[in-house]
Amino acid sequence: MKFRPYHNDIWMREGTQFRPALEGETMEIFNYLVEFMRTLVTYAFNLTEMVGFPSYGMAIIILTVFIKAILAPLTVKQIKSMKAMQELQPRMKELQDKYKNDPARMQAEMAAMYKELGVNPLAGCLPLLVQMPFLIAIFYALQGYPYNPAFEHFLWLPSLGEADPYYILPVLSALSTWVMSKQTGMGASGAAAQQQKIMTIFMPLFIGYISLNFPSGLVIYWIVSNVFQFVQQHFIYKGLEANK
């Protein structure tokens, strides 16, 4: 079989094998990661077959929960760091106002405050950077996954490889993103609160809009991921409040 475009040329077909269309040596490791994610989708589907309920939709849900559970320690670290920085916002604002004409002194005072309280302002970035390759890889993996036509339907969806014709998933993706944004912004103050307010409006609209054309399987991944993280953050926040 000749190569042919498959879902926006992200993947190409050769016989029964699929390979990424991303080129360049720098992308080789990422391509392997995408291939690995696609293999996990297949394994998850095989698992649903073993229990007598073959479903790619359930396979995506299982894989999403698995990935989020594996990345949970990094997510917990990121959330704790983010909450710590939110709680420091009032003190940071005081220092900014007090030393607004002396940037060097302001930075020194902030560094001393971080050291005193054991807070690293960059601690929340590293976990996110580690997670991003996996999240992007599953995005590409689901974007062009070669579903078996006999099992690519799920619930009201005729095909997980196509956009939701009834627009239910885009609404759910926007709603779940809005709930996540509201939860994440709890406790923010000052400029951070204003930025979070803007994101709470913009992100759900943006995610809902792009979900109109994304494959349903990919949108299901996004929704389940949001629901998992909402529950995860709820218990993390609850634990942090109990330890105060």
What is each of the regions a protein language model found here?
Residues F18-K244:
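Helix-loop-helix
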